[in-house]
Amino acid sequence: MLAGPALVDLGAIIVAPDSLGGDWSTAENEKAVIALLDDVQARYAIDKAKVAVTGYSMGGAGTWHFAEKYPQRFSAAIPVAGRPPASAAGWKMPVLAVHSHDDQVVPFGPAEARIAELQKAGVNAKMIAVSGISHYETSRFRDALKQSVPWLKEVWK
């Protein structure tokens, strides 16, 4: 698992759903994720101002999607090796993208361009760019994702 070991210093509750059918943007997946969030928030004492969304690969694409579509549910987004939206017009949420220059499945360029677009718009947007890691070496993204912890703590101040 990537998120648990990388984000352990947050002392957070980590929820890691699987997509139904491979596309996070379907109504079925959106309903399932929002219901899961509602359930977890009802069961645990969670500060709703400190809920981040993160995911790897297709989960990274889902991170971009849920952060864009449900900004009231999340305070930050950390997509890892995920395809960003075509545009980030109107985006306000802090985002830290983790991506490899050597990703042969999800190219680096679109994520880099989206982060630059967000920065130009004044959004708290950062990128952790790594090299020498292919898309399929999930666990090798752990150290890069761990670097998001101080950033996230700063966002949550």
PLM segments and residue spans:
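Short amphipathic alpha-helix adjacent to the substrate-entry channel of hydrolases
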Residues: 1-15
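Gly/Ser-rich "nucleophile elbow"/oxyanion-hole loop immediately N-terminal to the catalytic nucleophile
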Residues: 23-58, 68-73
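Short beta-strand immediately N-terminal to the catalytic nucleophile in serine-hydrolase-like folds
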Residues: 53-55, 80, 98
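Hydrolases whose catalytic domains are alpha/beta-hydrolase-1, hotdog thioesterase
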Residues: 62-66
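A conserved short beta-strand
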Residues: 73-83
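Conserved serine/cysteine hydrolase catalytic core
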Residues: 84-92
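C-terminal catalytic histidine-bearing segment of alpha/beta-hydrolase fold enzymes
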Residues: 94, 98, 104, 108-157
